[in-house]
Amino acid sequence: MDLKDNSFAKKRSTVFVVLLIVFCFFLMFSAFADGFNFWSPWSTDFNSRVIHIKSDGNIETTSIVSHELHPDFKAVRFAFGLVIVLFISVIAVLMNWELSNSIFKNYEKLNLSLSLLSGIMVSGGMIPTFFVIYFREWNATVNWIWTASFAGMIVFLWAVYMISTSFIKIRPSLQVIYSLGAVICFIACIGTIYFSVIRGWTTIFLLIAIGVCTDTFAYLFGKRFGKNPLIKISPSKTWEGAFFGVTGTVLTISIICVLYSIPNYVRQPSIKDASKTALQTPQNYDVHNLITNVFLISFISGGSTFYIYWWVSTLALIFTASIFAIGGDLFFSYIKRLTKIKDFSKLLGKHGGILDRFDSSSFLISFFFIYHVIAGISSNQRLLMEPNTYFSAVS
């Protein structure tokens, strides 16, 4: 048994190292793509915007009318978003099917119907969203309407899941657990699309890395130092493993964030009109800045206050994300224990199913997406679906 555990631990360590190497490779690729390929979906030129300015020659009446995505790239970005939406919609169907099939195996038609509903809701919600983003105007009013619609979709799905499962013979607790798990998977899929397309691929990769780091550190240190069980539903998990998992993740992810988005001051960019008057424009967001994209921390202050704010906010959010990753792992482990299964499916062979691989990530992505939704409705400066862009043109 010890030999098997040691072998498994080595495999997990190898996977973790490989993921870090791949992440660094992607960062290098991103740097070259942003520097030399204007067609890159995450390049500076691809995200450039046209700023429309209205001025009567008086500083008091000078204002920015609007800032729109460059028209040459709207169709390409919409097509890119469409591909991501369709792919994640398929993932949503598979995740829901694995979850429902584990809880009520003998109801294939019900499983298929609920799974397809999840995929339809994902694609039906996000395709119109990207159409508005790239071919219409995403303003504060649209932002509120979208947020209300998103909340309505969650309530609708919860009601459908609860009502549908009430007609079959399962325990009420399993009924609630399934509905909760299915809604979380739905939010995670919407969040994955959002982070991948709107915030850049590095952000979704970083969120998945948080889940992988937490799981890996918790397992390795738990096997070595674990003595006190964390919770009865998962005897193999210990408090020591959870502590080192969270601590190791906070250190690792914060280092990655620092290396890839060095905390320099970002001044409010200004543009001068014909009368040489400086006009304040919106914050100049970096397409791949992990701190602003994931944690929504804007570098607009200086001195010691800036560094304290940066470190406290970043570390607190990474810590919270790691806790949610552990919660996701425990939640889906609890479902497997209740249903007496080892894996949700054999879709990925020895690695189990999609839910087995992304159980922790689904919780933390859902957390960060809800965090972004709340930030989007509470701040007038950063709308939820406003892409991170550079402002490079004036008309």
Swiss-Prot record:
Major location (coarse): membrane
PROSITE patterns: CDS (PS01315)
Subcellular location, record wording: Cell membrane
Transmembrane segment boundaries: 13-33, 78-98, 115-135, 144-164, 177-197, 201-221, 242-262, 306-326, 358-378
Gene Ontology BP terms: CDP-diacylglycerol biosynthetic process
Pathway of action: Phospholipid metabolism; CDP-diacylglycerol biosynthesis; CDP-diacylglycerol from sn-glycerol 3-phosphate: step 3/3
One annotated Gene Ontology cellular component of this protein: plasma membrane
Family listed: Belongs to the CDS family.
Protein name, per record: Putative phosphatidate cytidylyltransferase
Recorded name of the encoding gene: cdsA
